[in-house]
Swiss-Prot record:
EC identifiers of the protein: 2.4.2.7
Top-level taxonomic group: Bacteria
Protein name stated in the entry: Adenine phosphoribosyltransferase
NCBIfam families: apt, PRK02304.1-3, PRK02304.1-5
Length: 177
């Protein structure tokens, strides 16, 4: 079975007209979770993307980013929702379909010039990933690449990210599905 075949699709969630891609069915399966981490590890060992640290976006980016950090021998830095980090933070507000949200990172999380692999579970509109990239840059980091389990190219996030000059890698796409 493939990574894609282990992802549950839920129609009309969280609202009518949305096809939700649920990775919990993928990561609860030990073979599926291993496929994710092994494929990402292999990609980053073989493809010469130079980075120093992995930054994971709350919450599922922690699951993937933490395991990948361990597999690659890299440090892990969390990007969190407001009020969850105990020391001084940098914040980044970003727009959602209906409203806005904010994410934070410790101001001392990265060394100046650190090359970062930004990790999250799914790329849809790209808003959260671009906000996280802005945060990384605010605290002195450089985004080397963004990695996702799932890319939804039809939603437009991939193009938004590429238009900003960032590189992305995803394990599977749900295009036109």
């Amino acid at each position: 079975m493939t990574i894609k075949s282990r992802i549950r699709s839920i129609p009309d969630y969280p609202k009518k007209g949305i096809m939700f891609r649920d990775i919990t069915t993928l990561i609860k399966d030990p073979v599926g979770f291993r496929l994710v981490i092994d494929n990402l590890t292999q990609h980053y060992l073989q493809n010469g993307v130079d980075f120093d640290v992995i930054v994971g976006i709350e919450a599922r980016g922690f699951i993937i980013g933490g395991a990948l950090s361990y597999a690659l021998g890299k440090g892990f830095v969390p990007v969190r929702k407001p009020g969850k980090l105990p020391a001084d933070v940098a914040s980044q507000k970003y727009e959602l379909e209906y409203g806005s949200d904010t994410i934070e990172i410790h101001i001392d999380a990265l060394e100046e010039g650190s090359r970062v692999l930004l990790v999250d579970d799914l790329l849809a509109t790209g808003g959260t990933a671009l906000a996280a990239a802005a945060l990384v840059e605010k605290v002195g980091g450089v985004v080397a690449e963004m990695a996702f389990i799932v890319n939804l190219p039809d939603v437009g996030g991939e193009q938004r990210i590429l238009d900003k000059g960032y590189s992305i890698f995803s394990l599977t796409d749900f295009e036109g599905d």
